Structure formats: structure tokens, C-alpha cells
Amino acid sequence: MTSTGPETSETPGATTQRHGFGIDVGGSGIKGGIVDLDTGQLIGDRIKLLTPQPATPLAVAKTIAEVVNGFGWRGPLGVTYPGVVTHGVVRTAANVDKSWIGTNARDTIGAELGGQQVTILNDADAAGLAETRYGAGKNNPGLVVLLTFGTGIGSAVIHNGTLIPNTEFGHLEVGGKEAEERAASSVKEKNDWTYPKWAKQVIRVLIAIENAIWPDLFIAGGGISRKADKWVPLLENRTPVVPAALQNTAGIVGAAMASVADTTH
């Protein structure tokens, strides 16, 4: 059965459901699924394929098309990208091929899908949208900052539900180093730091962000957030910090959200 989405389905006695489709592009895998936009839950299973190597724009676009076609989805879709994207054009490339820089990803992916409408946005921005609507930031108005701790540090800023895209706080200079050189979880692993020692570096990054924009809430994401009990209580900055709630689905959900209400820049 082909899904045309974004769609609204009504059943007597049931609430109205809105469906969207999201793709999350990572350095090792490309995953996608249909999302219930009323609840933020995936409908059925997701499909995950290996990211092609080299991860050129055309190779990635073909893999995305394979995922989308696996669901028979024919409507608009959202796609995350691990870097800066403005007006559909890629500006940076870290975990993918450098040939992405300057590529109109929106058009390249759309062409592989026969002209389907594509919204593309930074992967951390997508996760931030999802977490503030359905996850750890739900019912928290004001200025919310998501930080994803991994190989680097990704960031998203959402103000009263509106995304401020491409913040790139991982490249903020903190004490003579970029924030991600100081406090990415990969730095902890490389140096074999204890959680208390690493937390001191995270505090420095959080304070630098606080001094710039005074957020109301930090959401800590990335794989290390699954062990938040070991380090979040050690953070002595002024703004509350909570672990991300959606984990592996946040990118797909946020991308699907963006496809329905284009929040990109």
C-alpha cells in the first residue's frame, strides 16, 4: 500500500492522526520511518541501511530513495544532515564526503525521488525539535538548548517551540579550545577520563553558553546520555540539565516534523 502523506486519517470514535516521514543520515547508517505527528511515535518498524562509502551526495540520495521506497511513501519528507544546511544547500561536511559542500541537497535527494518535496536540516536541530515537542523538553517554554555529545558536540536552540537553526555550539571557543575538543564524549574516551573529570569540562562549556544566551533548560543527548545518572548530577552550572528522552528516534521524528512545517533556514 502506498502512503501519500503528510496525511490525516480519521476513524469513527478515534482522534485525528497526522503522519509524516523522516530520514536520519549518519556517518554509518541511514534510517527512516513513518511518524505519528500527534504523539511523536514511529508507526511500525524503521528501515536502516548502511551509509554508502564514499558518502557522496548521489550515493546517499540513492540510499535515501531506497529507504523511502521501502515504505511506499510518496509525500513530503524530512532529511537530517550531519552539518550546516542553509536554504537546502550544504555548507559543511564532517562525517560524509567533502563533495557535499555547496551541493543543493534538497534538489539532489528530490530528483532521486521523482520530485517529492524534501526538507533538509541539521541533525542536531532535528533532534532538538523532537525533544522539545515530545521528549525531555516537553512543556518547557522559553529558551531550550539541546547538546549532543559524541564524536563532536552538536547543538540545537529552540525558543518557545521555534527552531533557531545551525548554532554549532560545538565550535564555540572555551578557554582557548573548541567546545567539542574539550567536552565531546570522544575526548572522555580518548583520555580515559572518569565521569567527574569529564563533567568539569562539560560545565565549562555549559557556562560559556549560559553567559551568551541564558537558556531555561539544557537537554543532554548523544549515546553518553544513557548514562546520565553518572554525570548529570555532577554538573554545577546554573541552568537545569536533563537527559534526552527519545534517543535513537529523535532524528527521524524531528525530520518528519520539519517536513510538515518547514522550520529550516
Curated annotation (Swiss-Prot):
Optimum pH is 9.5 and 9.6-9.5 with poly(P)(32) and ATP as the phosphoryl donors, respectively. It is an enzyme of class 2 (transferase). Its EC number is 2.7.1.63, 2.7.1.2. GO terms for molecular function: ATP binding; glucokinase activity; polyphosphate-glucose phosphotransferase activity. It comes from the Bacteria. ATP binds at residues 24-29. Residues 1-22 are annotated as: Disordered. InterPro entries: ATPase_NBD (IPR043129), ROK (IPR000600). It catalyses: [phosphate](n) + D-glucose = [phosphate](n-1) + D-glucose 6-phosphate + H(+); D-glucose + ATP = D-glucose 6-phosphate + ADP + H(+). Residues 1-18 have a biased composition (Polar residues). Belongs to the ROK (NagC/XylR) family. The poly(P)- and ATP-dependent glucokinase reactions both follow an ordered Bi-Bi mechanism, with glucose being the second substrate to bind and glucose 6-phosphate being released last. The mechanism of poly(P) utilization is not strictly processive and is most likely nonprocessive, where there is dissociation of poly(P) prior to complete utilization. Catalyzes the phosphorylation of glucose using polyphosphate or ATP as the phosphoryl donor. Polyphosphate, rather than ATP, seems to be the major phosphate donor for the enzyme in M.tuberculosis. GTP, UTP and CTP can replace ATP as phosphoryl donor. Homodimer. This is Polyphosphate glucokinase. It comes from Mycobacterium tuberculosis (strain ATCC 25177 / H37Ra).
